[in-house]
Amino acid sequence: DSTRKSYPKSAIFEKVGYWRGYEWASQFRNIGVKTWDANANETEAWVNSPYRKGEDHIGRAYGAQLRRWKGHDGKEIDQLMSVYERIRSGKDDRGLIMTFYNPGEFELGALRPCLHTHQFSILGDGLYLESQQRSNDTANGQSFNQIQIFWTLYTMAAITGLKPKKAVQNIANAHI
């Protein structure tokens, strides 16, 4: 058998959890996603971290960074709503960027993000997406991440009234 089974529902619902700002594996499990169980409860460095708040805590990883990024003044920035509102208004300032990659808070989360940045562009009535990934296990994660990227483009286009056009995935370190 030369094809690997893909799990589109898990990929999409994991992204839904990020968009909701989840910080607990139990929140993901409540929507049918088990992808965070091991990172939250079995990764030795995180299990022993003084920043871990208990069983199932994933910390300030993906969802927390997306919905509650800490600004220089301590105020929280909701990257998702900021980008959504600018896309919906048709304002492409070449800064329609959502990122989960916050080096100042790596120790506050279970792991550093692999698929870490999404940058949108508006051209006419079309929405484009370019996504950056620092690391990719091609055998296990590639199809999962591609589903998430396409879902991100199609969903953002749908809720902003634009047409989804093209998604590009840039991978810096692909490995087997």
Residue spans for each PLM region:
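Terminal, non-catalytic protein-protein interaction segments that mediate quaternary/complex assembly
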Residues: 1-176
